[in-house]
């Protein structure tokens, strides 16, 4: 019984040690503001193409196709 208790204690200590090293680091997120792409024309149906166009042509951080009434539009995300 003592051997079983020491194995359980060792496993618990290993779990605590592992959890201490795996703690996520918090980074202050930068707020992004969205606005419709100025270079995209037509309905947006390709997220990857929209993202590439926003990043490469408009110097945005990100881009995606979002539904904005009445159709999907390419929306670019810039730091506020």
UniProtKB/Swiss-Prot annotation:
The leader peptide range reads 1-29
Query: Which cysteines does the record link by disulfide bonds?
Result: 33-80, 44-65, 50-74, 54-76
> One Gene Ontology cellular component annotation?
extracellular region
Subcellular location field: Secreted
Pyrrolidone carboxylic acid carried by residues: 30
Q: What is its main location?
A: secreted
Q: Which UniProt keywords apply?
A: Antimicrobial, Disulfide bond, Fungicide, Plant defense, Pyrrolidone carboxylic acid, Secreted, Signal
Instruction: Please provide the Gene Ontology terms (biological process) for this protein.
Output: defense response to fungus; killing of cells of another organism
Pfam families membership: Gamma-thionin
What superkingdom heads the lineage? Eukaryota
CDD domains xrefs = Knot1 (cd00107)
Q: How does it assemble?
A: Forms oligomers in its native state.
Q: Tell me the PANTHER family matching this sequence.
A: DEFENSIN-LIKE PROTEIN 1 (PTHR33147), DEFENSIN-LIKE PROTEIN 13 (PTHR33147:SF101)
What role does this protein play? Possesses antifungal activity sensitive to inorganic cations.
Tell me its family.
Answer: Belongs to the DEFL family.
Name recorded for this polypeptide: Defensin-like protein 1
Q: What is the organism of origin for this protein?
A: Raphanus sativus (Radish)
